[in-house]
């Protein structure tokens, strides 16, 4: 629309590397949301996207984030997919007084005035997931995870929860991000025979584990998902589309599934039918989309993209997003989110239970 002013927004997602698949979903969700805002007559401004691709290299996030802020006059950056990349960007946005909008699940135990956490942390994903699974399948667990912050912290939290509730951790193993040599994990699962497996692996490691576990279940009925499921906090609909039947019957927890029945999701999917009809919509896509919507709503409320004013305009105020009507906690900058337990069926997760 002619005459509309523009506010620059940084988009910082990788198109390659071991976590490229979910990162591409985040990128697509953010860019679609920017197109949605710019096409709307409701907003008297445009958002101008500036995208940098760190190519999956954690040490590039800080320099690219700094470049976005200093050279492109960006005050809001939507992006980062891993805790390593987020932690690289934090000192930059804190020093330069910008806001990083982080749209990926993480392990929790972090607060920054310059971050808005637009996805679930452990009390919003892992805790409700274990509360759902243990009474239904048992509390003897095998823990597998990526050998970095996400895997370490989620496994630690799971151990604490299980031990406090009388459960048992039969084994715990880590593999490097992207490592697909996971036969030793399957061998230990076969030996320990847990009630369920908590999968904190990432990307190709997780996909390889699910495929190998499917083969184990075909050889031994004890390891079929209806008897011993794999549960995850970071497995998205955009990922299971390429897994065939390997994910079928296993569980995840998320603040969003495409199959959710709500006025907000109905409106969101109608928007995407026009703007991004080929999208495989999942939580990461919806979270990145929601981050951009929150930026736009806050700018409209305060009349500026200044980080302090935007932060103040959001606190205690509800914003309608694909995730529902959400608000930012004034003390932690975390978004208050529901937890939906889903079971994989075909290319989607069917919602089994919603916990608020």
Model-derived segments and spans:
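Extracytosolic ligand-binding ectodomains
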Residues: 1-356
């Amino acid at each position: 629309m002619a005459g509309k002013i523009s506010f620059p927004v940084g988009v910082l997602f990788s198109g390659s590397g071991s976590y490229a698949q979910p990162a591409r979903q985040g990128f697509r969700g953010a860019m679609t949301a920017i197109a949605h805002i710019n096409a709307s007559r409701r907003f008297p401004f445009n958002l101008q996207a500036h995208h940098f691709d760190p190519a999956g290299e954690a040490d590039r996030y800080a320099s690219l984030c700094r470049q976005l802020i200093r050279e492109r006059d960006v005050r809001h950056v939507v992006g980062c997919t891993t805790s390593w990349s987020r932690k690289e960007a934090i000192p930059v946005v804190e020093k330069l007084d910008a806001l990083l909008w982080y749209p990926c699940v993480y392990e929790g135990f972090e607060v920054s005035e310059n971050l808005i956490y637009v996805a679930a942390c452990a009390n919003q994903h892992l805790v409700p997931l274990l509360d759902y699974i243990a009474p239904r399948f048992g509390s003897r667990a095998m823990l597998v995870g990526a050998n970095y912050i996400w895997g370490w912290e989620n496994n630690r939290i799971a151990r604490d929860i299980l031990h406090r509730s009388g459960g048992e951790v039969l084994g715990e193993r880590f593999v490097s991000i992207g490592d697909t040599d996971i036969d030793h994990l399957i061998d230990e699962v076969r030996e320990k025979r847990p009630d369920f497996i908590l999968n904190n692996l990432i990307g190709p490691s997780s996909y390889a584990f699910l495929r190998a576990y499917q083969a184990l279940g075909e050889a031994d009925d004890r390891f079929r998902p209806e008897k011993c499921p794999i549960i995850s906090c970071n497995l998205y609909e955009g990922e299971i589309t390429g897994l065939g039947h390997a994910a079928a019957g296993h569980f995840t927890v998320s603040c969003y599934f495409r199959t959710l029945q709500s006025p907000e999701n109905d409106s969101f999917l109608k928007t995407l039918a026009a703007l991004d009809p080929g999208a495989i919509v999942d939580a990461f896509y919806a979270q990145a989309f929601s981050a951009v919507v929150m930026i736009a709503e806050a700018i409209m409320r305060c009349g500026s993209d200044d980080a302090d004013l935007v932060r103040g305009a959001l606190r205690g105020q509800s914003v309608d997003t694909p995730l529902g009507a959400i608000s930012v906690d004034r003390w932690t900058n975390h978004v208050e989110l529901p937890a939906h337990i889903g079971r994989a069926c075909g290319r989607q997760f069917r919602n089994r239970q919603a916990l608020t």
